[in-house]
């Protein structure tokens, strides 16, 4: 090996799987699940007893974590379901561009410029108003299955 230092830009997933398997019977309310290829937060779980033919079934009612749409799925409790890797990261807001993208400061001092303003009206108003007032804002970004979206805001005081 040489004494050269090797620097590389680390990507969040680095080729890792976007989901992991978990037995349907062990997924609880408040957990996450993939339904119709969408990452969802479970809001209701009900289990039916085993019938004459087959397994106990789990009925999941879940909300898509990015669109807010309600999705349902029924899975035998002994089968595996895909569970998304969901991450929340806080970034400091630096700028809002004319075309609706935000410029965020990462932990290592780089900028992240590939996120749009939130689609939620109240969150959008909080971000725009806070930025216009010159407040120091920290935005929470949720990421799962290759998608990212601004999901929260914190005011850390005036600039």
Curated annotation (Swiss-Prot):
PROSITE patterns: IF5A_HYPUSINE. SUPFAM superfamilies: Nucleic acid-binding proteins, Translation proteins SH3-like domain. Coiled coil: none annotated. One of its GO terms (molecular function) is translation initiation factor activity. Residues 1-23 are annotated as: Disordered. One of its GO terms (biological process) is positive regulation of translational termination. Keywords: Hypusine, Initiation factor, Protein biosynthesis. The keyword Heme does not apply. Lys-52 undergoes hypusination, a unique post-translational modification that consists in the addition of a butylamino group from spermidine to lysine side chain, leading to the formation of the unusual amino acid hypusine. eIF-5As are the only known proteins to undergo this modification, which is essential for their function. Residues 1-12 have a biased composition (Basic and acidic residues). It comes from the Eukaryota. Translation factor that promotes translation elongation and termination, particularly upon ribosome stalling at specific amino acid sequence contexts. Binds between the exit (E) and peptidyl (P) site of the ribosome and promotes rescue of stalled ribosome: specifically required for efficient translation of polyproline-containing peptides as well as other motifs that stall the ribosome. Acts as a ribosome quality control (RQC) cofactor by joining the RQC complex to facilitate peptidyl transfer during CAT tailing step. Belongs to the eIF-5A family. PANTHER family: TRANSLATION INITIATION FACTOR 5A FAMILY MEMBER. This is Eukaryotic translation initiation factor 5A-1.
């Amino acid at each position: 090996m040489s004494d050269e230092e090797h620097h590389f830009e680390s990507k969040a997933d680095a080729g890792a799987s976007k989901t992991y398997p978990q037995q349907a019977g062990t997924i609880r309310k408040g957990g996450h699940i993939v339904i119709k290829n969408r990452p969802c937060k479970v809001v209701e779980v009900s289990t039916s007893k085993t019938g004459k033919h087959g397994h106990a079934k789990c009925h999941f009612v879940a909300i898509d974590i990015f669109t807010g749409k309600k999705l349902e799925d029924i899975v035998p409790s002994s089968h595996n379901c895909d569970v998304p890797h969901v991450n929340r990261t806080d970034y400091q807001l630096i700028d809002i561009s004319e075309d609706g993208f935000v410029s965020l400061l990462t932990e290592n001092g780089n900028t992240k410029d590939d996120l749009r303003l939130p689609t939620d009206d109240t969150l959008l108003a909080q971000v725009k108003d806070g930025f216009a007032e010159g407040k120091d804002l920290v935005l929470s970004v949720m990421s799962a299955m290759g998608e990212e979206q601004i999901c929260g805001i914190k005011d850390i005081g005036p600039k």
